[in-house]
Amino acid sequence: MQQFQLYINGKFEDGAAQFDSINPATGEIWAKMPEARTDQVNRAVDAAEQAFYDSSWSGLTASQRGKLLYKLADLVEKSAPRLAALETTDTGKIIRETSSQIAYVAEYYRYYAGLADKIEGSFIPVDKPDMQAWLVREPVGVVAAIVPWNSQLFLSAVKVGPALAAGCTVVLKASEEAPAPLLEFAKLIDEAGFPAGVVNVITGFGPECGAVLSAHPKVAHIAFTGGPETAKHIVRNSAENLAKVSLELGGKSPFIVFADTDINSALNAQIAAIFAATGQSCVAGSRLLIEESIKDEFLQRLAERVQSIKMGLPDDMQTEYGPLCTLKQREKIQQVVQRSVEQGAKLITGGQVCDGAGYYYPPTILDCSGVSDAQSIHTELFGPVLSVDTFSTEAEAIQKANSTPYGLASGVFTSNLTRAHRMTRAIRSGIVWLNTYRVVSPLAPFGGYGLSGHGREGGLSAALEYTTTKTVWLRMSDQPIDDPFVMR
């Protein structure tokens, strides 16, 4: 049975205790994970603070920090098979996805390596002839990066990459539900040659790990991806120290299909939007809003396509669809699906727990047309359940798309260019995908509105999240200050 360790102040160590990690494909224990408790969390933060001020890190130029990130990116690529296999075993995500996602992880680190020496200040043209002023951007300090189990390597890269590029130090908390990929990633941090304490990797449970980390007075910035309820706890914990908080939370993203679109493209994109990663994605397009005139044809073809999705063991490259991560998640999904059917939703496909080992749940489509209170329409399930509703006008599509407190992502399929522009203006979401879905790039900011959080990841915007500004004034005159009591 595999064993993993924490990484604190440049050294690997056992946790205060151990806990089991379950393989979602089999339901069996496959590894022992280290549990960090209060003392180890405190030591990780102390190490990060000490490293932040130590010349071995603070004395590096921006381009030198970039070189370390370039090396890390190369190591991620070199270790891709191992990292992908661990993520597949620990989370149940299919190897086809974890393998391809590792390439994105390397690209994000490479992008921020190149950006490190391009985080610039600016000259301020003040209206005072005897004064000059300029703006300096400085790293904010110790960053607590808290990520969920799904896509841990990717979701940590979009935090750790810009934080290190900006000159911050990091305590990275891996989800206790599947921490193996990030605990393995710590070995790459060590091999890349980052000074001790610059990046620390821990895992553990909420009360003695996450809560201690988010309330720590030495943490200057908390970057969190996860659910709104946990986010509220983090914000409350951080309030005592007024730490900066950036949140990338969940969503109930609308996937809007107009009758004038290319149906084949929309079908494939909808499959990707909700059934890729078994629906366990913050941007899952879990609400299909379909123009009424094409509903029957679209649903028939979608149901036929869903039946051909190959479910199987996640480590098989032929598998298209794997298990859910936890038994608890499967039980929640089944309860919501059953309740929605009781409320009047029509089951098109799926809806029953799969027989056999592992936490499998079939691709499920619920026709919720005319059942506006169906629970599946309003609940972020984090699973493979598509709720279908119709619209007859553009205004109705917009109203239904925005009828949620979330606002992370949306998809719009139409061949009408002016309509596409109108929809992007009207929809309240941080990302709008037009005639595509689930596309990312290191250059493009990512984030949401409302209960989907605030702050942005990706692009220059993300690096600036980890900086603070300092305004510097210089008096140019040789003349003495004549009146000290007058504001200049």
UniProtKB/Swiss-Prot annotation:
The organism of origin for this protein: Acinetobacter baylyi (strain ATCC 33305 / BD413 / ADP1)
> Which residues act catalytically here?
E248, C282
> Which family does the entry's similarity section mention?
Belongs to the aldehyde dehydrogenase family.
Instruction: Return the Gene3D superfamilies for the record.
Output: Aldehyde Dehydrogenase, Chain A, domain 1, Aldehyde Dehydrogenase, Chain A, domain 2
Q: How does it assemble?
A: Homodimer.
Q: Which reaction does it catalyse?
A: (Z)-2-((N-methylformamido)methylene)-5-hydroxybutanolactone + NAD(+) + H2O = (E)-2-((N-methylformamido) methylene)succinate + NADH + 3 H(+)
What Gene Ontology terms describe what this protein does at the molecular function level?
oxidoreductase activity, acting on the aldehyde or oxo group of donors, NAD or NADP as acceptor
Q: Tell me the function of this protein.
A: Involved in the degradation of the pyridine ring of trigonelline (TG; N-methylnicotinate) into succinate and methylamine as carbon and nitrogen sources, respectively. Catalyzes the NAD(+)-dependent oxidation of (Z)-2-((N-methylformamido)methylene)-5-hydroxybutyrolactone (MFMB) to yield (E)-2-((N-methylformamido)methylene)succinate (MFMS).
- Per UniProt, NAD(+) binds at W149, N150, G226, G227, L249, E380
Q: Which InterPro entries match?
A: Ald_DH/histidinol_DH (IPR016161), Ald_DH_C (IPR016163), Ald_DH_CS_CYS (IPR016160), Ald_DH_CS_GLU (IPR029510), Ald_DH_N (IPR016162), Aldehyde_DH_dom (IPR015590)
* Sorted UniProt keywords: NAD, Oxidoreductase
Q: What is this protein called?
A: (Z)-2-((N-methylformamido)methylene)-5-hydroxybutyrolactone dehydrogenase
Protein EC: 1.2.1.-
